[in-house]
Amino acid sequence: MGMRGVVLAVALGAPGVVAADCAGVTIMACPVEGSGKILEVCAEPKGFTYSFGPAGAPELRLAAPYAKGPVIPWPGVGRAIWSAVRFPADGFAYEAWISVDRLTENAAPVGGVDVFAMPGDELVASIDCRPGPWFGDIMGPEDAMADAGYCWDWAMGLWREGGCP
């Protein structure tokens, strides 16, 4: 199975599926476990956006420009295919992530956001997406970075604008 553009549906027409409110491309949109809130990550023309809260009225909105290299790419090994986008704000980093077990046939995606205190990356909160139908594009963050003209330099461990060696 090719990794570029792998979209996990996550049945957009099914009842209970989160309707994304992105101006650009939806990376993930899911209901949050144990609440009526929505977690959403979008790829916009200049970078990624993150929103969290009730549908249509998020309590928190953050942005991470492509130039800051906010995507933590899947290294290509391990049981799970995953991707994450990091949104720094006010002494914290909100890391929205999506993952799927690649060894389990028809595995449902999992996702959520981990909140880290900065500096030091101390995990202070972890919020999971509710199981069930929701939308996620596993390789969407990497694809958005590439579409914006960036490539991941594996030797340096960072995103470069333009070509990579």
Task: List the predicted regions and their residue ranges.
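N-terminal signal peptide c-region/cleavage motif recognized by signal peptidases
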Residues: 14-17
